[in-house]
Regions:
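A short, structured beta-strand/loop element
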Residues: 43-61
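Short, conserved charged micro-motifs
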Residues: 15-20, 77-83
Length: 97
């Protein structure tokens, strides 16, 4: 059995954006106050959690929301963790210009 593995990502998103964006991974949007979701992956799971941080002000004009989003993998191999992380990153990727 694989020991739990946790990774953290500093992200710029609100709780509402997190709840909406995670929907393709969970099969539906999270409820209004939910800050984490457990996602079944093969014979294991991933707990994805949102932890808000103070926003940062850019150029005195714009406040950017910040949060630590953690992924805690239970019972997954390195290959499975890598595949899920790639899917997570793609799901949360935003267009730039």
């Amino acid at each position: 059995m694989h020991e739990p593995v946790r990774i953290e990502k500093l992200m710029s998103l609100t709780l509402r954006e997190f709840q909406y964006t995670i929907a393709p991974l969970t099969g539906g949007a999270l409820g209004a106050e939910r800050t984490e979701a457990e996602i079944r992956v093969g014979s294991g799971s991933v707990v994805v959690a949102y932890d808000p941080r103070p926003s940062v002000r850019l150029g005195g004009l714009i406040d950017m929301p910040r949060a630590i989003v953690s992924l805690t993998f239970h019972g997954l191999s390195q290959t499975e963790r890598d595949a899920f992380t790639k899917r997570f990153d793609f799901t949360f990727q935003r267009g730039g210009g």
